C-alpha cells in the first residue's frame, strides 16, 4: 500500500516558506525574459538568486543527473528543457520556467509560462487554457474527494478547447522528498485511483497541454521532452496544501488572481 504523508503544522510552515521562495523566483525572472537572452543566462540568474539571496538550494541541480538549476521549455518542448548558451529566445516564443527549491529539508515546485515579446494568438490561447485547467483543478480540491476528480476536471475542460493532455507525466506528492506519493494524473483515462484527499496532504498539480497531438518523445539528451508533431506545449504548476476549506496554494505569485480566470467556466 502506498504511504501518503500527512504534514503537521511545523512541516506545513516550512513548506509555506519554501513555497514562497519558489514564487519569488518566478516573479523575479519575468523582467529578464526578452528576445536575445539565452536560457543559460536565465538559469544562471535563477541559480544565483536561489543560492546567494535566498540561501537555499536549486532542487533540480544534480537531481538524477539533471545538469542545471531550472528547466526551460520553449515552444514544442513539453518539459525538462535543459538551459544552454545556444538556446536564444526570440520574439513570439512561449517558454515555461520550472523552479524547484530545497530549504530547511523541505521541497517546493512550481512553473509558469512567459511570453517573449508579442506572442501568437495560438500561443496566447494555449497558455490561457493550460493556466485555467490548473485553476479548475485547484478549485475542485477539498478533503473527501477522490483524487481522480482532478484529472477528470482538467480533461473535460481541455477537450472542449480542442487541445490535448500529455499523459506520460504527472504531478506528485512533495515535502521532505522532491517526489512523494501520490501521483497526480491530469486526465481520467485510468479510472482505478482510489486515493481520497485528506487535509494535510501536499502535492503538485502541473498539467501539460499541447496544441496538437498528445504524443511526445524524449530527445537524445535523455531529459528534453518534445511534442511529436512539433506543436506548441504549455504548462502551469503549483504546489498546494489540502486544508479544510479546500486548498492553500503554497507557490502563489504576486498579482495572481485565480478568481478572475475562473469567472468564465466554459
Swiss-Prot record:
The gene is map. It comes from Buchnera aphidicola subsp. Baizongia pistaciae (strain Bp). Pfam families: Peptidase_M24. GO terms for biological process: proteolysis. Binds 2 divalent metal cations per subunit. Has a high-affinity and a low affinity metal-binding site. The true nature of the physiological cofactor is under debate. The enzyme is active with cobalt, zinc, manganese or divalent iron ions. Most likely, methionine aminopeptidases function as mononuclear Fe(2+)-metalloproteases under physiological conditions, and the catalytically relevant metal-binding site has been assigned to the histidine-containing high-affinity site. A divalent metal cation 2 binds at residues 109, 172, 206, 237. It is an enzyme of class 3 (hydrolase). This is Methionine aminopeptidase. A divalent metal cation 1 binds at residues 98, 109, 237. GO terms for cellular component: cytosol. NCBIfam families: met_pdase_I. Belongs to the peptidase M24A family. Methionine aminopeptidase type 1 subfamily.
